[in-house]
Amino acid sequence: MAQQRRGGRRRRKVDFIAANHIEYIDYKDTDLLRRFISERGKILPRRVTGTSAKNQRKLTIAIKRARIMGLLPFVAED
């Protein structure tokens, strides 16, 4: 028997930062930054989070600063 393809339109991801009118991404705001980090401690890509290119660059800088300051871990603990 032939398999039926199930498909639908994928919902477009919304930029969380732009949607909530966050103008400045602060490296001390670890609750916000943790939304964009995987369980392993890696920075999630744009295609997963839906952030714009500009906000992704700001996020990356803020996450790296928070790691250096010791606010976020470089890798997850097992």
From Swiss-Prot:
Keyword RNA-binding: yes
Cellular component GO terms, alphabetical: cytosolic small ribosomal subunit
GO BP annotations, alphabetical order: translation
Cysteine pairings via disulfide bonds: none
UniProt keywords, alphabetically: Ribonucleoprotein, Ribosomal protein, RNA-binding, rRNA-binding
Pfam family membership, one: Ribosomal_S18
Signal peptide (UniProt feature, chain positions): none
Gene Ontology molecular function: small ribosomal subunit rRNA binding; structural constituent of ribosome
Keyword Kinase: no
Protein family: Belongs to the bacterial ribosomal protein bS18 family.
PANTHER family according to UniProt: 30S RIBOSOMAL PROTEIN S18, SMALL RIBOSOMAL SUBUNIT PROTEIN BS18M
Function: Binds as a heterodimer with protein bS6 to the central domain of the 16S rRNA, where it helps stabilize the platform of the 30S subunit.
Subunit structure: Part of the 30S ribosomal subunit. Forms a tight heterodimer with protein bS6.
Protein name (database record): Small ribosomal subunit protein bS18
